[in-house]
Design a protein with these regions (language model features):
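P-loop NTP-binding module
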Residues: 1-240
């Protein structure tokens, strides 16, 4: 179970120090992912959820911080949730000059990267308000955007909209090497979570696992995606 606090500006960086429980558990999560998928070249990760308010943005932010520091590669966190963007709030930076502005041609991509206190981590925020987010994400320009991002960065973490309400996360699937699904314990019905996983599988997303987010502050557990099928097991069991 993973505790995802409601983060105010700058709190992601304050949470992410070597001694914090959050940093320790995300190091553990990253280590498990790295060991389990050592034979696969995983560079582009999508983080999503079944529905809203399950902690996906905080998860994506902490995972990006972890990979930037401990993988020691050029890492970028991209906010593709154009309806309810949150990455800029988590890091306390402006939302403007981001994904939407690049896709509409208002800005060049390399002028929109934003620095963070973590040396190897940059951000691409959601950008300005758009009237048709799905249409914009589904445009050919999105593929061009990710092609250019991958030229500049070694690891890409994408915070996408939830799967059930809109199709944006599924549209992004061709650009991703794998996906993590964040589920809120005690609130997300199993059938809703299973439906989200099925939609992602049908879209061709490689589901790396399910992160159970518990607001009560219990230390995290990471489950293989079979948790929402007929069986479940954590990574310690899978690694045996």
């Amino acid at each position: 179970m993973l505790s995802m606090p409601r983060s105010s500006a700058h709190s992601i960086i304050s949470l992410f120090n070597d001694e914090s429980p959050e940093a320790n558990e995300f190091r553990r999560l990253y280590s498990k992912l790295k060991n389990l998928y050592a034979d696969e070249e995983m560079k582009n990760f999508l983080v999503t959820s079944a529905k809203m308010n399950e902690g996906k943005s905080t998860t994506a932010a902490l995972l990006a911080c972890t990979i930037a520091r401990y993988r020691n590669t050029k890492t970028i966190l991209v906010d593709c949730d154009l309806r309810r963007p949150r990455v800029h709030q988590l890091f306390g930076i402006p939302k403007e000059e981001g994904v939407a502005d690049v896709l509409t041609g208002a800005r060049k991509l390399d002028t929109c990267f934003k620095q963070t206190p973590i040396e190897n981590l940059r951000l691409l925020t959601a950008g300005g308000v758009v009237t048709s987010p799905t249409e914009l994400i589904n445009s050919p320009r999105m593929h061009d955007l990710f092609s250019e991002i991958k030229f500049y960065f070694d690891t890409v973490i994408v915070d996408s909209p939830p799967v059930i309400p809109v199709t944006d996360a599924l549209i992004l699937s061709p650009e991703m090497d794998g996906a993590l699904v964040v589920i809120k314990a005690g609130e997300t019905h199993k059938e809703v979570a299973r439906r989200a996983v099925d939609l992602m599988r049908n879209a061709g997303l490689n589901i790396l696992g399910v992160i159970i987010n518990n607001q009560k502050g219990v230390l995290p557990y990471y489950y293989d995606h079979k948790y929402y099928g007929y069986s479940y097991y954590n990574l310690e069991e899978k690694a045996k």
